[in-house]
Amino acid sequence: MGLVVVGAGGRMGQTLIRTIQSIEGAKLVGAIERSGSPFLGKDAGEVTGIGTLGVAITDDPLPVFAKAHGVLDFTSPAASVEFAGLAAQARIVHVIGTTGCSAEDDEKIRAAARHATIVKSGNMSLGVNLLSVLVQKAAEALGPEDFDIEILEMHHRHKVDAPSGTALLLGEAAARGRDIALADNSVRVRDGYTGPRETGAIGFATLRGGSVIGDHSVILAGTGERVVLSHHAEDRSIFARGAIKAALWAHGKKPGLYSMLDVLGLNT
């Protein structure tokens, strides 16, 4: 499967390029960067330190998409919306690991999925997506009258969105377990005199610092006991492997919007 990496010069872009080389059935056929990037014109393999691959980084995505089977995208919300439209024009797979998308962004991506096969997830790791299933089941079994749900996440100092896409993914899983809407029941900020905790609320706490790739814990706190479900990312390659697995799974599927739960056969 011929894959294009967008944001090829970034941390995740370089990780994707390296990881593609080790996965059977996947081949790098294109690399995209923004206009003005210092990486333009350079070989994608040389930028990542793995030697020449014969793939030059360009800022003109559509001709590259037209010759590919799929796109791997961990960029920004605005860029991902643009790439989704181009993937729809090219009728190819678009794997989106970008976080921080607004409701309007998601609607545009959903529209693009009429013609592109899109897999979008707040986290591409296999472990986190299994964790989301466990969180949903725990939230369903341990009801709001007895257990409060708090989601704690920590990432490196450079992360620009909060809560993380993974924290929101886990919050959505907890909300599904409780049969409530996360948007109406989440608490993102606590400061000053807040009063007692509202029954059924799902709280979020965000930490930023150092080089932490991603730590997430879902705490179900009852009277006299706590259940903690956690995931700790130790290497960005877990996200790259998950994204490539998603692309290979989506290749040949009909257009539509899918998630990693679909890829893993965990969507209930």
UniProtKB/Swiss-Prot annotation:
It catalyses: (S)-2,3,4,5-tetrahydrodipicolinate + NAD(+) + H2O = (2S,4S)-4-hydroxy-2,3,4,5-tetrahydrodipicolinate + NADH + H(+); (S)-2,3,4,5-tetrahydrodipicolinate + NADP(+) + H2O = (2S,4S)-4-hydroxy-2,3,4,5-tetrahydrodipicolinate + NADPH + H(+). It holds the Pfam family DapB_C. HAMAP family: DapB. It comes from Brucella abortus (strain 2308). NAD(+) binds at G7, A8, G9, G10, R11, M12, E33, G97, T98, T99, S121, G122, N123, M124. The active site is at H155, K159. This is 4-hydroxy-tetrahydrodipicolinate reductase. Coiled coil: none annotated. GO terms for molecular function: 4-hydroxy-tetrahydrodipicolinate reductase; NAD binding; NADP binding; oxidoreductase activity, acting on CH or CH2 groups, NAD or NADP as acceptor. Belongs to the DapB family. The gene is dapB. InterPro entries: DapB_C (IPR022663), DapB_N (IPR000846), DapB_N_CS (IPR022664), DHDPR_bac (IPR023940), NAD(P)-bd_dom_sf (IPR036291).
